[in-house]
């Protein structure tokens, strides 16, 4: 761990600890009982968390968030964050090319030490996310710890953008943007499960560029021009349309495609993903205590003679479900999310690119993540299982990449504020 990272991590963690303590104190401090009023006042509206980063249903950000008057930077700037630790054990660890050894069977790490700064009022708004993180996901790639993940992925300022909101219909964003594509977010705390799934592995996570948004009644539309898979080549268009059918049902469609071929290779991605076209169809419904979210995915990678590979297609389907126990029950704060996925690739071993466990491979996954949150504090356990067929060595699991399955057990615990 180099000095710059150590300094940043120490300062970020210190700031997070101080803010978390402030939030916890504010949450736990009681005041003397007031003199009863002649008549009860109407109940105030429930406080809302900051708009960014986005969160799934199993964890909730602190509400209301800590708000500060920062003068020229805004009089209602909210500052929040997450500090969390992560422990993992796995079967069939894969070969780690950076160390020349097999990936560790067990790992203890810092999964998040991040601060979030939001200004979400007025015409000029902004969001800044800063800190350290790791990005565990279901794949045949070795785990990259939080001391190295920012340098290998999106830096210590992974997301940050300026947002112009001229009216209630239109808005515009520029900067490092969360992707419009897919049904899972980038960071562990944002999702139902700690690890992102198989389908997430072929989706962009953060893209740099510009984005326009419009809302027309129940229909919300966003279109972006970006560098796609963080390639630093601005040749990719993406879009998202979301139809809010009613209070409990939404239907969404997204896509991303490059406008021309590219041969960019970075630590984050490759020409395979940089030249990928992807579509997702997603439906979300709430039934009682259940949130049910199925989605379908299709990807296509066109041949690239410069890099030397042919065409590859993939089809995927996933079902994400969360059951949250009633807030009035003895198990208030407990939820049980799970995810089931299937992904199939169409390609030949000769020259097709690899987007799974070798050209022509397919895989199933099952992940369950019992979760408990009390105020800002949370803990969740996770068990995941992946089994693949038509695995091409060395793209599978194990030291030689010839194994077709992996089991993982994970604990993540921390504080959101």
Go through each PLM region and give its residues.
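N-terminal periplasmic/intermembrane-space "pro-region" immediately following the signal or transit peptide
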Residues: 1-95, 417
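Outer-membrane beta-barrel pore domains
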Residues: 3-5, 29, 37, 41-44, ...
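Small-residue packing motifs within transmembrane alpha-helices
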Residues: 6-14, 214, 243, 323
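Enrichment for repetitive, rod-forming helical segments
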Residues: 11, 125-126, 136, 203, ...
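Outer membrane beta-barrel
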Residues: 63-96, 100-238, 242-251, 326, ...
């Amino acid at each position: 761990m180099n000095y710059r990272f150590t300094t940043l991590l120490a300062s970020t963690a210190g700031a997070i600890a101080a803010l978390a303590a402030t939030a916890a104190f504010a949450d736990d401090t009681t005041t003397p009982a007031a003199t009863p009023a002649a008549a009860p006042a109407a109940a105030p509206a429930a406080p809302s968390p900051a708009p960014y980063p986005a969160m799934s249903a199993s964890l909730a950000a602190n509400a209301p968030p800590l708000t500060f008057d920062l003068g020229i930077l805004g009089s209602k700037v909210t500052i929040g964050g997450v500090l969390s630790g992560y422990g993992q054990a796995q079967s069939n660890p894969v070969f780690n090319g950076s160390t020349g050894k097999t990936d560790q069977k067990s790992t203890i790490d810092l999964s998040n030490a991040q601060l979030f700064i939001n200004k979400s009022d007025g015409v000029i708004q902004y969001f800044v996310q800063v800190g350290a993180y790791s990005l565990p996901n279901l794949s045949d790639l070795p785990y990259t710890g939080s001391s190295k993940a920012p340098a290998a992925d999106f830096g210590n300022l992974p997301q940050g953008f300026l947002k112009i909101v001229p009216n209630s219909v239109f808005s515009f964003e520029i900067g490092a943007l969360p992707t419009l594509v897919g049904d899972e977010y980038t960071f562990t705390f944002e999702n139902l499960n700690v690890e992102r799934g198989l389908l997430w592995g072929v989706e962009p996570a953060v893209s740099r560029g510009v984005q326009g948004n419009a809302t027309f009644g129940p229909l919300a539309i966003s279109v972006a021009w970006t560098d796609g898979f963080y390639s630093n080549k601005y040749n990719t268009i993406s879009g998202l349309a979301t139809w809010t059918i009613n209070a409990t049902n939404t239907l969404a469609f997204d896509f991303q495609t490059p406008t021309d071929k590219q041969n960019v290779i970075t630590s984050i991605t490759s020409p395979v993903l940089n030249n990928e076209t992807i579509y997702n169809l997603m439906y979300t419904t709430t039934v009682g205590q259940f949130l049910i979210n199925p989605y379908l995915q299709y990807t296509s990678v066109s041949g690239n003679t410069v890099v030397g590979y042919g065409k590859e297609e993939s089809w995927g389907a996933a079902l994400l479900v969360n059951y949250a126990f009633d807030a009035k029950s003895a198990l208030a704060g407990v939820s049980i999310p799970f995810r089931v996925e299937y992904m199939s690739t169409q390609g030949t071993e000769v020259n097709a690119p690899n987007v799974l466990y070798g050209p022509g491979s397919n895989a199933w996954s099952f992940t369950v993540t019992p979760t408990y949150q009390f105020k800002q504090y949370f803990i969740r356990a996770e068990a995941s299982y992946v089994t693949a067929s038509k695995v091409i060595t060395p793209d599978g699991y194990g030291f030689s990449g010839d194994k077709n399955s992996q089991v993982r057990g994970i604990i993540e615990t921390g504080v959101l504020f």
